[in-house]
Amino acid sequence: MKPTEPIQFDNEPQSNEVRAEILALEPYAIRTFTPSQCVISYSSGSYHYTPEGRKLADFTSGVLVANLGHNPVSWWNRVQTYLGLNALNDGGEYAKCVPLTAYNAITEIEATANQRLITSLQSAPGGSRINQIMWSASGSEAVQKALWAAMKRTPGKDMIIATRGGFHGKKGLAGAVTGSEQDKERDERVRFVSFPKAECIDIESRKQPLDLTSYQAELDALWEECGDRLCCIITEPYLGGGGSLHPQKEYLQLLQQFCRDHDLLFILDEIQANFGRTGPMYAFTHYEVEPDIVLLGKGLANGVPASAAVGRRDVFECLDYGEASDTWSANPLSSAAVIATLDEFEQNDVIAKGLELSRVIEAGLVRLKETQLIANVRGEGCVWGIECADFGDKPSNDVANDIIRACYQGNTDGQAIHLLGALAGNVIRISPPLTMNVEECQHYLDVMYDICQSLAQ
């Protein structure tokens, strides 16, 4: 959607001014449309605050990034310590601390981040194949680097199987393995396999046994067509951008077994799913698979731009020296943030907090079905999707936008919720920080229920 006028709300003069300035000076292309377009002055824990002083519960975690919550003091203290920023108080024009960029050099903090992340991955069930890292600053870059390595592993094997309806990015090969064969400007080296959308449309349907026959047949047909050129399968633990669709674990296990049978690489893009988001530390544990390459990002550094392709040494070493380098990979700031995030998970039992929160979220979202505005609920851990229903003469897409807008405006007591723009048109993602207080989360789920009830009147 491309608004011709800035989004405006009553009683938000400062926010409205910022919205108008953004619309005038930045292109539409840099942001996803959200009917609320929340203006944030500062954030703390599980809440955002607007220039007018309004408080909003953050049910987005900044698109699955702030798994620890926004600006945890202990995390920031760790980041500052790792960077040596205490030297800022020593006086002088320049501080003696770790540089923010170290291109064409290496740092001790980078080495520490490497060791800590590899140790964490290898200690997780399913992480035994992982022994090298390629760092990046964004998810798309991590995807691209992993695919470069896979395509160079065996000369002549440069074709990729991706999941139809998946999302891996908008750039280069990451964009090529996103979507389906119907998209424009499709890379001919990419083929797609179906995803069991109907079978996991709701948490109840996901409990049913999954018939793998048709998916196996698709894979066999692709092997027959282009097996001599195939190098890998790339998929997600769950389809995030495709509508928060969480498959039965047998589906991912089928893809992995196909790779094992044909000596293909199994690449799991869990950039939206890692660091506790689906329950355990890594989604591959949750789905009981053992990928050759795993893609990490978002919650990896709790807000500092960082991503990584982690996987087999024999695969990554197919790339030439410097072939996957870029200005910001493994920069000291992101390295410090990754180490600090690992510290927080290891010392504060964040996983247990997320699992407790998950039960509250599931019950609260299932209750929303009573309003008749919600048709399906699906998810796991602290990442959920509620699929809106057609209601009266309103299509489900409009219902979703109405809910997002009404939650932003809040109830009569001013209690409000920040939500992302709808996925796949009519699916609202619910993904608060794993550290959100359980009672507070329950309260805002109740607020959301009351708002939906009012919209349904």
What are these model-derived regions, one by one?
Residues 2-457:
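Conserved N-terminal phosphate-binding loop of PLP-dependent enzymes in the Aspartate aminotransferase
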